Swiss-Prot record:
Catalytic activity: iminosuccinate + dihydroxyacetone phosphate = quinolinate + phosphate + 2 H2O + H(+)
Keywords: 4Fe-4S, Cytoplasm, Iron, Iron-sulfur, Metal-binding, Pyridine nucleotide biosynthesis, Transferase
Organism: Bacillus cereus (strain G9842)
Cofactor binding remark: Binds 1 [4Fe-4S] cluster per subunit.
Pathway terms, separated by semicolons: Cofactor biosynthesis; NAD(+) biosynthesis; quinolinate from iminoaspartate: step 1/1
Root EC class: transferase
Transmembrane segments: none
Protein name (Swiss-Prot/TrEMBL): Quinolinate synthase
Amino acid sequence: MSILEKVQPIETMLPERYHKMSKEDMEKRVHEIKEKMGKMLFIPGHHYQKDEVVQFSDAAGDSLQLAQVAASNKDAKYIVFCGVHFMAETADMLTTDDQIVILPDMRAGCSMADMADIEQTERAWKELTKLFGDTMIPLTYVNSTAAIKAFCGRNGGATVTSSNAKQMVSWAFTQKERLVFLPDQHLGRNTAYDLGIPLDKMAVWDPHTDSLEYDGDIEEIQVILWKGHCSVHQNFTVKNIENVRKNHPDMNIIVHPECCYEVVAASDYAGSTKYIIDMIESAPSGSKWAIGTEMNLVNRIIQQHPDKEIVSLNPFMCPCLTMNRIDLPHLLWALETIERGEEINVISVDKQVTAEAVLALNRMLERV
């Protein structure tokens, strides 16, 4: 059975009439529907969403915050999730059976989540077990499919976010001697290193060659990193940092831990989306910042803090393209179909997958 037990009906083409509507008319209709539906409708929005979408969010946050609000909301019948596919899956798994989760555009995926599929993961686990026996525990970044979360759940593991990665990695080492971290090698490496694990005690599993890449003694490997990454944060480089240091020596550099180890090591600060937002918020007026994260968020931070000099670490950075698929026309389309009693782009995860994935999610949520 497919992980998505049903996605009824699957709609990917926005009706033509939404292309012809003015922004003002669309905004007016969204306001009308939100007012009409009241608590029956809940719209969570990720920080990386466009301003035209975030303005209508009932809750804006990073992956951890949105997982928490999804789990705590018991009033809404409809949850229209303005994020990407894995986030909507998580919302469906953490809400009740009578709550309906809708993703405005089914094309809003995540390339990182797609870098670890369940067949690859099961195969990797089998091969790694031959090497290390029953000494491993899996952790997966929430930026992963429901199937990968379920794999971690049934193998004693948990999910993590960039906000709680250190806490969850520390917990994992109270359970087993070794950690398998999926699917983002950079978050896993940066977190483990920050906790005092040297690089030569980390290895990388390549799912395309089914091979383990390492430099040190295999017996001393503590962390096995999945060879995946975020296509947005991969674009920040040490060269970007060198340019900022040269041209703006008094500028602080803050990056997301999905950036590679070399970039994080060369930066002044590194932390989750919430950490970055809070750091800029609390910084003194007149301070200068180069931020290494998604462009929609950077632009919003710039707008919110005119008293500070803020730039993107990479001046040629673009937004997360899949996150950007959720726009005002798609949001309105989803809301108007609900208003008519129709349901498009419903996310409904298979119940067995949900049961196992929720084990992993709850092991995280009960510790944060």
